Amino acid sequence: MNKALKTLKERGFFQQCTDIDGLSDLMDKESVTFYVGTDPTGPSLHIGHMVPFFALRHLRETGHCGIALIGGGTARIGDPSGKTEMRKIISYEEIDENVKRFENQLNKFIGFDGKTALLDNNKYWLADMNYIDFMRDIGSCFSVNRMLTFESYKKRMETGLSFLEFSYQLLQSYDFLKLHERHNCCLQIGGDDQWGNIVAGADLIRRKTGKQVYGLTFPLITRSDGKKMGKTEKGALFLDPVMTPVFDFFQYWRNVADADVRKFFLLFTFLPVAEIDEIMTGDINKAKERLAWEVTAVIHGKDEADKALAGAKAAFGGSGDTSSMPTKEIASGEFQGGLGVVDLFFMSGLSATKSEARRLVQQGGAYITGNDGKERQITDIAEIVEEKDFNDKGELILRAGKKKYLRLVLQK
């Protein structure tokens, strides 16, 4: 097997391929241009979107050329793959704004140089396309009977599938054809939920040009408990630091299950496999800390990773920079005569209700790091917190349970 494909397989980026032997032979002979697509249906990429883009970087490092295709056109419809109901239709203006955000995030992660990594947008050929011409030229190449055999459609037949969504496969297939014409792209990679769309695109190119192209998919990434990877209590793990603060991003990786650490090292870092295996022979908590730092550094940069690490250490009662932690300002007047811990955890937002805050304290899940720099457990629901409990920076660190932290900053 080709070296680049071995790397993908070794690191967990391989589920199935349309013709692994043919693709391997081609990649041995020449530099292959391939593409990854993503639709800007939200204001930020999340970590689930990034799996194929990590693969893109691995393939680029072995001499191949990757195209990141932003679906400024297909986002106007919405891909039904992996969805149980129709996506909300969003305005063209919102899509265009999302495109700009996606492009900035991907450029930061990939670095588009026009040679080894390219950026394209299917809005350029889809937005003003003539419907009649498209259906005559492209629609005639598709069999409805065959389309209905793909899982992405079969799963939706019982719950309802609009014609708008049903036509999505034609558009994604057309993307592959256009990229083949524009850039000699001969490989599409993506999650395994895209298998039907990828195969359809390869078939379309064969019908139109007589040439063979390839498709390769990755497993859908799940945690060891079977749940979808990259989900938090607050939703998806976004790349936008406003939507997911860097500290929270870091803490997600720091708190993954032991059984997931090696898998996530392989998928979401660029450390050599031998180095990962060496890390895994040591203390598991140190391995998780390293994982959190590495992934945060890849996505947000080394400086932000350092700040998040320092904030995590400070949150556990050690010394360190707390500036990266989720922060809330609170007026000093709230502490005149003292403020009860139940009210404090409720006002901070760490507990949704006062009853929840009371249970948190009673069950031993409430912690404070104050003026002595040491974290302590709150055991008395009647305890009062005063202004003097804040440290000399005017900070008080709260923790609810194992994973929720907040830095309170006193405003005079």
Name each model-derived stretch:
Residues M1-Q194, V199-A202, T209-Y214, K227, ...:
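NTP-dependent nucleotidyl-transfer catalytic core
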Residues I205-K412:
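Conserved nucleotide- and phosphate/pyrophosphate-binding catalytic cores
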